[in-house]
Every structure is written in C-alpha cells, then in structure tokens.
C-alpha cells in the first residue's frame, strides 16, 4: 500500500509536535480506522522502564493503581498525584518479562523519570528511559490473518494484555464505549520504519495523529495536559477503576493524594465532569484551554478540539458538575462558538457516597 501524499507535520505549537498530522486525507484516514485498518506513528511519546526485584511493590507504593502483583502481560493505566490529590502524571503501564514499561506524554517523560529516580531510596529498582516507539493501530481488519502474520502473532491478545514481539510487545487496549479494536505496538525506535512497512504490505493504511485524536475524543478518553488542568482530580475525568478498567484503585494502601481520593469518593460529588461537546463549525475554531460559558459566566474549560469524520467539530471539556445537557454553551474567541453537550457523555446518575449519606441522615435529608 502506498502513501497517498507526503506527510503533513503536526503543528509545532501543539502537543504532537514532531509527529505526522495526516497524509493528505485526514477524514479518509479516520474512516479507515472505523472500517479497515490504520497504523499511526506515535513515537513521540515517552517510554520508560523499571527493572529490579522491587519494581512492582515500589511503584505500587507511590502511585494510584493496584500494581504490586500485576500479572505477566497485564496492562493498565496509572497516575501520580500531588499532595492535594491533583493529577500530575498519567501513564500506560505494561508488565512483561521482568520489566515494567511506562509510556506517557512526550513532555512528561523527563519529569516523570526524574520523580521516579528521586523516590527509589533503598529499593531494588532502576528507572530508565527506553529508546522505544509506540505505533497505534485502529480498525476491525487488524484481526485478519495478513495483519496477524505481519505482527508475528497467532492471535490478538486479550483486552488490557500484551504479548512479546521482536524486541518489544503488542498490547491490546480496552475497547471503550464504541467497542472498537485498538492495539499499541511498542518496538525499538530504530525498527519502527520496518514495522510500518511490514504493516503496509499487509494492507494497513498509514495515518496521522489527527485520526488518533478524533478516535480518542469521540471515545471520551482524556489526555493529560489537554483535557486536564492543574486542578484536575481523577474522579472528574473517569480515571477511577482497578487494573485494566481505570487508573485509581479505591482499595489500596497509602499514596500521595489518597486522602482527597477517599474523601471525594465518600462524598460522591467531584466538582467537575468530563463531557463531549459538539461545536458550531461555522465560527472560528476554539482552542484548548478556552473558557466554556453559559449565560455569560464561565462554567468550564475546553480540552482537545478536533474535526471528526462523522461527528464534525467536537471537543472534550471539563464542566461544572450537574450542568444540564440542554444548557446553551459558548466558547472560543469572544465566546462566539456555540456548543452543546452530548447527553450520552454525561456521567451516570450520582450515587450518594457513604460519608454524605451519613451527614444527610443526621440532617434528616435521607431515610
């Protein structure tokens, strides 16, 4: 399969600087991700490794996920919080062949590595940068025999699991609301081009990160630093859940920021919620970080903005919790861009946490 056009680089000022934005047909690439098979070079992501006998129990003690005995081949999300429970780092974690792999945003790999090294103390663990590239694959045809042969596997791994490949591993991501097939191929950086060529020969079309971002936003998956800000706590963006389901396990021991996690869980009311917005495409495009307004008052913050092949201009946004789905919203320069909440993206009806239930019983507010 030949590349249709020369690669168009991602904007230098954006989070994917240095990556390919698209190959001349961005909407066609998105369609291929839904109906065929697409490979996206995300090698600008940072990859770290942890080795040593204490790596799992040590990381368990300083992060939010339950990973002290993460099984061979398992993969999960994980976080590092500050003392107030606000998100500092998010990564995808994979356990394979005596090594724990962490991949994270390009601009956070260095700070995360510095933090991990500072926390080693007397533990038998060595954090290091890894010269590995992440290639993401989308589409239903990834399960076809020709693609499996190109990947060097007999069958795809289970969701939230990984299998070794030549010099790296193949990881299957959770399907999400749309149930779409998504894989990550993590391989030596020097071999990434060879892997892309092999996949192209198997019928997998090359695509840019625009296609990946459209898929991610439509799936309502937040991205650190784009859909989060300096105040974000895990409950606001759907990161609560055990291995393979979320990034924060609610039944584990002490870690930095745990008090906030427990308090918000017990009270049951995080201050904000992550939603999908549909934007008016006739106005100037808004930008990440723009305020979202209702009735002239700020009610939230705009996250990733992207044009989707089926949904048109969409964005993720952190909005004041409890805002009705039919609220008229505006964002962008001079609040000139109309926006509406996708009702399917609203959080499930809130359950009253144990702490709040006790308070309301004392006040006579609950039976």
What do these predicted ranges mean?
Residues 38-39, 47, 89-223:
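Acidic, low-complexity central loop/insert segments
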């Amino acid at each position: 399969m030949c590349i249709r056009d020369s690669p168009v680089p991602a904007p230098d000022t954006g989070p994917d600087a240095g990556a390919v934005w698209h190959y001349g047909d961005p909407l066609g690439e998105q369609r291929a991700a839904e109906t065929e098979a697409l490979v996206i070079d995300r090698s600008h992501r940072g990859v770290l490794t942890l080795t040593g006998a204490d790596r799992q129990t040590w990381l368990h003690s300083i992060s939010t996920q339950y990973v002290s005995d993460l099984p061979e081949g398992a993969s999960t999300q994980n976080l590092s919080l500050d003392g107030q429970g606000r998100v500092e780092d998010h990564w995808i974690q994979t356990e394979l062949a005596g090594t724990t792999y962490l991949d994270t945003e390009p601009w956070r790999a260095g700070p995360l590595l510095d933090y991990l090294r500072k926390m080693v103390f007397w533990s038998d663990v060595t954090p290091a940068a890894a010269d590995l590239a992440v290639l993401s694959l989308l589409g239903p045809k990834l399960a076809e025999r020709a693609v499996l042969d190109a990947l060097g596997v007999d069958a795809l791994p289970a969701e939230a699991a990984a299998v070794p490949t030549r010099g790296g591993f193949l990881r299957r991501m959770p399907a999400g609301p749309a149930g779409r097939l998504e894989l990550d191929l993590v391989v030596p950086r020097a071999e990434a081009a060879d892997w892309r060529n092999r996949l192209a020969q198997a019928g997998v079309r090359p695509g840019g990160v625009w296609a990946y971002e459209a898929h991610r936003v439509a799936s309502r998956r937040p991205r650190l630093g784009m859909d989060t800000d300096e105040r974000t706590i895990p409950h606001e963006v759907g990161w609560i859940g055990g291995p393979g389901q979320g990034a924060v396990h609610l039944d584990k021991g002490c870690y930095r920021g745990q008090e906030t996690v427990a308090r918000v869980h017990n009270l049951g009311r995080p201050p904000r919620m992550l939603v999908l917005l549909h934007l008016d495409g006739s106005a100037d495009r808004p930008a990440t970080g723009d305020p979202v307004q209702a009735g002239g008052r700020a009610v939230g913050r705009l996250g990733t903005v992207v044009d989707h092949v089926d949904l048109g201009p969409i964005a993720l946004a952190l909005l004041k919790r409890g805002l009705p789905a039919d609220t008229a919203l505006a964002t962008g320069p001079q609040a000139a861009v109309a926006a509406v909440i996708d009702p399917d993206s609203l959080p499930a009806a809130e359950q009253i946490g144990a702490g709040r239930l006790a308070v309301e019983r004392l006040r006579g507010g609950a039976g």
